Amino acid sequence: MSSTSLEEENTIVIESTTSSSTTMQTTSTTTTTTKEIFATDEFGIEMLEPTEEMKKQLDDLISFIEKRTELKFAQYPKFQLYTLEGYRDYSEASYLDDFEKDYEEGEWERAVLSENMWGLTTSSPDQMKKLIVEFQRCASAGSYNLLDETLRVPIKRNQKKFNFWEQSVIVHELVHSLQGQVVNLSNWYQVMKDSDDFMNYPGRRSIMEGQADLVQAYWESTLDSYDRQQMNSERPSFSCSVSLPSYFYIPFDLYYGYGGSLIKQVHRAGKMEAINEALFQLPTAEQIYSPEKYFSKEPYVNVDIETLELEEYSFIDKGQLDSLDIVYLLQSKIGQVDAVNAAIGLGGGSWVDYINDKNDLFMTVKIQGDNEQELNEIGEAFMNWANFQSRFTKITTDGNSWNGNLY
């Protein structure tokens, strides 16, 4: 357990008088005061103790959320409070801890190489890791961890009550805590981690964020105009010291933008009961981008792809392709509207990665459209993606067996 030392230097004046002279002596002493730390987390980072006023505020927020969602907490939510810098330190330490556990030797380098190949970045693996660490430090006002089921938010040291901004953030994260208890999100996420298959994550995450945003908006609507202005003034600065690539934010567009739009339609159709039912669904990313496909329950098609025997290359990994992947790959070159339009036509897809002794990566991709027209639109989107990049040379063929463009 660490401590905070506050040093105070005091000057003490002592006067002594004799019959012959007067002498003044000055003595300097140092007093050290040690402040006990309430607790530290698993990384040794200081946590702040909630006051009784804060606990009462949490109780009130929990009651508000239960009323709005029509759901009940099975147990009191776990939470940890930090200073802003402490919260950023936790975000960094947590990411690096997961990084060491999640990536096998060479896996991270291949992941970045794949992004290089698709033209998303020119950064090296080390540079990309530093970017993501900075992103973790500066991108979040609060968090809920799906595995340890703990809510974490930054506050100011020595404050007695949560301010309006902090309460708004806490409402959002408390909704996630409630969702985690109702749906057992911890077990669901652990299964995905164990299988290294996160295909179901984007859709459910979008539903979760949509509901949390809605309840958060309900809470903010209880504030009068003066309190809302006060809340906006209390928002801390979350500036990043580096310029982050635009594609970092593409998944968040899905979760908070398109997901929020879908939740509003679900709410109009069946109120909060319908949203609660949606928490148990596993919608595809395509259904989030296109709500009519959500309501029609259009399925994702599993596409079989052949593993090839390639000279000098060996198989390394395989997986499925979803609509978020399409947008992720294409948006930075052809724009959001065209990328999303192509993604909405995806029936299903698969990919296989191969690697050689020089660590060069080769990928095969197989895509199925919802129909022939949708498949053609996806193909045109990829051709436009290639046309926007000078690294490709276009060769038009008109052969006997097939027509098309090679790059």
Regions found by a protein language model. Give the residues of each.
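Extracellular mucin-like PTS domains
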Residues: 3-5, 10-34
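A metal-dependent hydrolase signature that marks the N-terminal structural subdomain at the beginning
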Residues: 14, 32-127
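Second-shell loop/turn segments in exported
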Residues: 43-54, 154-165, 195-205, 246-253, ...
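Post-HExxH zinc-binding segment in Zn-dependent metallohydrolases
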Residues: 61, 182-184, 189-236
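Active-site recognition of the HExxH zinc-binding catalytic motif
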Residues: 65, 168-184, 209-213
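Active-site scaffold of zinc-dependent metalloenzymes
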Residues: 104-164, 174, 180-181
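Pan-zinc metallopeptidase signature
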Residues: 243-366
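C-terminal soluble interaction/assembly domains
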Residues: 359-407
